[in-house]
């Protein structure tokens, strides 16, 4: 992440890094889900997808979209991109396809609005990433390898807290770099916590929470976690 920050503005840095964090999370989430679904068949997600059982693959894809809201084939997972990096390959075309595959898998589904444009701010052809294709590939590869160390704790059902922490950290870093403009979209954690406590005081359960000036969503996230 620090490598990216040296090449671009705080806002660009945030969009790239957050996008890659979400990509890693979605990849690990679906791989864990699919492996669990296939446990009785004695197969892993990758093994099932490389098989000739088209009915099995169709059922698995349908289950993923229904339960998770999206689908992505094993060849487009974050771990696959990391493997390409290990083999010194150019990852940019594959990475671009991977991000598009996730968004496209939700078209016509209830989750389409949630995933539409999720990675639209990631421009892998941006000159800010380097002068040459090799420069861009190296920079993005370095960032993905660095982010690969994040453990979302999916098996321990702690993914919401960890993903939320990562999101709030990135938003906070952007706000620090954006100065006064940050007030247009970001409520500092201290202010968010006070508002959240006011909202939940005396209530056992909240059905809905509305932020009329929602920007980054950090206030809603803080309320959900209080």
Residues covered by each model-derived region:
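Conserved class I S-adenosyl-L-methionine
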Residues: 205-213
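Conserved SAM-binding loop of SAM-dependent methyltransferases across substrates and taxa
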Residues: 216-226
């Amino acid at each position: 992440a620090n490598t990216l920050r040296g090449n671009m503005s705080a806002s660009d840095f945030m969009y790239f890094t957050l996008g890659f964090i979400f990509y890693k999370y979605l990849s690990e989430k679906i791989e864990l889900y699919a492996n669990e679904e296939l446990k009785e068949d004695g197969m892993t997600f990758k093994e099932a997808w490389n098989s000739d059982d088209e009915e099995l693959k169709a059922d698995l894809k349908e289950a993923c979209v229904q339960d998770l809201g999206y689908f992505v084939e094993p060849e487009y997972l974050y771990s696959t991109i990391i493997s390409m990096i290990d083999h010194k390959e150019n990852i940019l075309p594959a990475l671009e396809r991977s991000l598009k595959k996730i968004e496209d898998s939700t078209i016509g589904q209830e989750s389409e609005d949630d995933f539409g444009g999720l990675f639209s701010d990631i421009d892998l052809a941006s000159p800010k990433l380097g002068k040459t294709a090799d420069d861009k590939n190296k920079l993005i590869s370095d960032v993905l390898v660095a982010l690969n160390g994040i453990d979302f704790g999916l098996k321990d059902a702690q993914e919401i807290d960890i993903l939320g922490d990562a999101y709030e950290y990135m938003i906070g870093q952007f706000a620090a770099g954006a100065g006064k403009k940050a007030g247009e979209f970001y409520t500092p954690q201290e202010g968010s916590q006070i508002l959240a406590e006011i909202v939940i005081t005396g209530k056992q359960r909240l059905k809905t929470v509305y932020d009329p000036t929602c920007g980054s969503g950090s206030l809603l996230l803080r309320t959900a976690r209080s």
